[in-house]
Amino acid sequence: MNSRPQAFFSDFGARCFYRPLAPKSDFLCHADFLKMITLHQLRTGYPGKVIGRQLSATAQPGTLTALLGSNGSGKSTLLRTLAALQPPLNSVPDSLLLAGKPVQQYARHELARMLSVVLTHRPDSDALTVAEVVEMGRIPYLSTFSAYQRLWQKSVGADAAAVRQAMEQTATLPFSHRPLSTLSDGERQRVFIAKALAQGTPVILLDEPTAFLDFPSKVALMQLLQHLAHHEQKTIILSTHDVELALQFADHLWLLGTEGIVQGVPATLAADGSIARFFQTEGLQFDAATLRFTVSV
């Protein structure tokens, strides 16, 4: 099944895209698609505590963006703000735009069809099977009553197609009947990514998805996310401490520091010294040619 966005021209002459397996009226026009996420002088944090100041950056469809920064720099806070799980500290509406529209202006059901989130801390769902977890990604497309029914009945129609496709893409279909509690960390991570894919959103946000995984699983996960961004035209943003993997797989970097965000493609940020300056630590050397770090003994 071809799940890439299908282009068409609206009555106004704008190039638009249907979202696969979403209602036919749900489409995004090319002007909005150029910058799916826009931050402009965004301030993040909590009442009485500012964590991120003057944050400006963009993320486009078809790209994998890695958010890098030290512990306590505000990566998780920024992702939660992007996901509208906590409000920006700015009073200016255009400080955070999603497809050209202020995030605060989206209704909850609209937002659930625009972006999905894979957080480090997830609700307890160990008693559910893999298929049941992935099916929950379709709840934004159901009425309240049918949403509760769906927890106890098999998915049908477009919902079943979306669930199956998501599990095929993440290689979770072979163990779809297994309880989540029986899976490895890497398998569990793929299940929650499958749930995000089943949700059918153009944007996916992930908070440290490679944490607690062994190295082969980290590589496999980054390959999957890169593939989804490029072939499904998803806008994917992930935070990570696996810097070298991010340099190899990400299309763009957001370097989150005390003075804001430095953004760009890895090769450019390596060549102009931005990465070396950002990770400047005694005894740590960065090779811009190989995009690798070495430790001086």
Residue ranges and their predicted role:
Residues A83:
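Helix-to-loop junction immediately C-terminal to a conserved catalytic motif
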Residues F279-V297:
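ABC ATPase nucleotide-binding domains
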Residues I204-D207:
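Catalytic Walker B motif of ABC-type/P-loop ATPase nucleotide-binding domains
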Residues L68-S70:
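The feature captures the beta-strand-to-loop junction immediately N-terminal to the Walker
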Residues P179-L183:
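Conserved ABC ATPase signature
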Residues T240-H241:
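H-loop/switch region of ABC-family ATPase nucleotide-binding domains
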Residues E135, R150-F175:
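Conserved ABC ATPase "signature" region
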